[in-house]
């Protein structure tokens, strides 16, 4: 088995998307390929077919490789709960909650497991494309490292270092990163990539030549800046308002927003414009208001209560505005949230917004499962996955929203008596073309706009991955990349 590792000078330089590109390129060239990231920190996660939890970046990379996502692609997932602690998920299951300091000391315990699991990939794939995290030059974290150079040494992987020129200072960041590494670590870096370049590459060439001379490492290529309709795990997606859009969908930007990839599929609707609500001042009058998931539901509810957004939501509801809550957002819409086991806070309970007649109790065990069903009385197919620690029960004024077909006798979500406020535990619900079409056509009808068929999100995503692969293939010296892996080229 051959392997290659993509490391970066910082977070958000494009490691994840370049790994996805390479996975698709290698697949196109006839190789069986697998993505791998030993440790991922993200509030965006995914549930596999067997009910295990993993990071979303490796899900996209798995699709690029033509694989069903599985937890061996991301054996450790860290989900921040506060600024100083996180939930540790190992091989798809909750390991515990740890402070940053305790986890730093805990990492070395995982190294043997990571090595053993990685070795199992040798018999399954021709190539493994490994993604690092942050920067290998975070020298304060070098001891017990299991995700950058520590992992590269553990599995003996050659490294390609990526820098983001769009932020400025790319030559300094590449040079500084290399210089801060130990000599044996520098030798692992076989090439560099400059990502997100705008303009004429000829202008860069003097700088590239000087950098290559200074660090004695070749540049494998310059990748241009481009926009794709693909999810971004590293930070909440940024929305560009569409000039001719007629439907305004607004999303509450919670401090601990999780699984914001839930709304990605709405971006592909031509007449839909998405925006974030960050304060009561920019609430506006949206056609649809989405309250997304949260890793700290109670904390985020207190946040929107304090800054006036909750009052705006209630005023919007009184005017028959359409509100859709997902997971934590669904819980916030209810009457009461109870936390008897102190899962999120020392508060025993907190009143919700009271817009849905439900009561939620946080449990100690997390629910992680794939689901499929249909909107009750509508026969609109729904699919997605659940990740939550709360169990919600109905009051007299709420009725179930979705009938779950793969869990007998179980209903999901709730709808108010007026039908304008609804919530669900199902992440990825808008990925399904049928459900997305149902919601957006409801808004179109309300505004007197012609109905449209929704495109299949998976088809759009696959086409965008192909486009990504074409851009990256044409930008990089693929012969050199194959060479550092000990491969002559296409099969």
Curated annotation (Swiss-Prot):
A Gene Ontology molecular-function term? ABC-type vitamin B12 transporter activity
Q: Does the record's keyword annotation contain Cytoplasm?
A: no
What is a single Pfam family found in this protein's UniProt entry?
GATase_3
Q: Which residues form the GATase cobBQ-type domain?
A: 246-435
Name the Gene Ontology biological process terms: cobalamin biosynthetic process
Q: Which residues form the signal peptide?
A: none
The record's keywords, sorted A to Z, are: Cobalamin biosynthesis, Glutamine amidotransferase
- The protein's annotated pathway: Cofactor biosynthesis; adenosylcobalamin biosynthesis
Q: Which family does it belong to?
A: Belongs to the CobB/CobQ family. CobQ subfamily.
UniProt-listed PANTHER family = COBYRIC ACID SYNTHASE, DETHIOBIOTIN SYNTHETASE
Q: What is the recorded function of this protein according to its Swiss-Prot or TrEMBL entry? A: Catalyzes amidations at positions B, D, E, and G on adenosylcobyrinic A,C-diamide. NH(2) groups are provided by glutamine, and one molecule of ATP is hydrogenolyzed for each amidation.
Name of this protein:
Cobyric acid synthase
Q: Which organism is it from?
A: Clostridium acetobutylicum (strain ATCC 824 / DSM 792 / JCM 1419 / IAM 19013 / LMG 5710 / NBRC 13948 / NRRL B-527 / VKM B-1787 / 2291 / W)
């Amino acid at each position: 088995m051959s392997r290659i590792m993509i490391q970066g000078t910082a977070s958000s330089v494009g490691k994840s998307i370049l790994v996805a590109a390479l996975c698709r390129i290698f697949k196109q060239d006839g190789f069986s390929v697998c993505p791998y990231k030993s440790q991922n920190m993200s509030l965006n996660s995914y549930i596999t077919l067997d009910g295990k939890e993993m990071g979303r970046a490796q899900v996209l990379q798995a699709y690029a490789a033509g694989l069903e996502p599985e937890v061996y692609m991301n054996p450790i997932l860290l989900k921040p709960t506060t600024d100083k602690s996180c939930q540790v998920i190992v091989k798809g299951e909750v390991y515990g909650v740890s402070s940053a300091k305790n986890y730093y000391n805990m990492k070395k315990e995982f190294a043997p497991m990571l090595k053993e699991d990685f070795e199992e990939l040798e018999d399954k794939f021709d190539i493994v494309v490994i993604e690092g995290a942050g920067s290998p030059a975070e020298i304060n974290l070098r001891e017990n490292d299991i995700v950058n150079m520590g992992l590269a040494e553990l599995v003996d992987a050659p490294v390609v270092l990526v820098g983001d020129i769009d932020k400025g200072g790319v030559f300094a960041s590449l040079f500084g990163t290399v210089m801060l590494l130990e000599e044996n670590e520098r030798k692992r870096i076989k090439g560099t990539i400059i990502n997100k370049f705008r303009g004429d590459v000829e202008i860069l060439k003097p700088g590239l030549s000087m950098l290559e001379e200074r660090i004695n490492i070749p540049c494998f290529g310059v990748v241009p800046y481009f926009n794709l309709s693909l999810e971004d795990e590293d930070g909440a997606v940024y929305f560009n308002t569409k000039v001719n859009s007629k439907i305004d969908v607004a999303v509450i930007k919670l401090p601990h927003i999780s699984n914001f990839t839930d709304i990605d599929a709405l971006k592909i609707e031509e007449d839909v414009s998405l925006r974030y609500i960050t304060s009561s001042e920019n609430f506006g009058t949206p056609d649809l208001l989405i309250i997304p998931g949260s890793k700290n539901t109670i904390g985020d509810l207190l946040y929107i209560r304090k800054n006036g957004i909750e009052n705006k939501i209630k005023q919007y509801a009184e005017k028959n505005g359409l509100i859709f809550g997902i997971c934590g957002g669904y819980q916030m819409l209810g009457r009461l949230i109870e936390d008897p086991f102190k899962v999120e806070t020392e508060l025993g309970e907190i009143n919700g917004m009271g817009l849905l007649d439900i009561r939620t109790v946080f449990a100690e065990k997390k629910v992680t499962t794939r689901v499929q069903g249909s909107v009750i009385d509508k026969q609109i197919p729904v699919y997605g996955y659940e990740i939550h620690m709360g169990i919600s029960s109905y009051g007299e004024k709420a009725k179930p929203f979705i009938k779950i077909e793969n869990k007998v006798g179980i209903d999901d979500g709730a709808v108010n008596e007026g039908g304008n406020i609804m919530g669900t535990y199902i992440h990825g619900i808008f990925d399904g073309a049928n459900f997305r079409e149902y919601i957006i056509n409801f808004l179109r009808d309300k505004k007197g706009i012609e109905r449209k068929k929704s495109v299949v999100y998976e088809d759009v995503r696959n086409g965008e991955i192909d486009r990504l692969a074409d851009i990256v293939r044409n930008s990089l010296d693929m012969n050199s990349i194959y060479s550092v892996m000990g491969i002559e080229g296409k099969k």
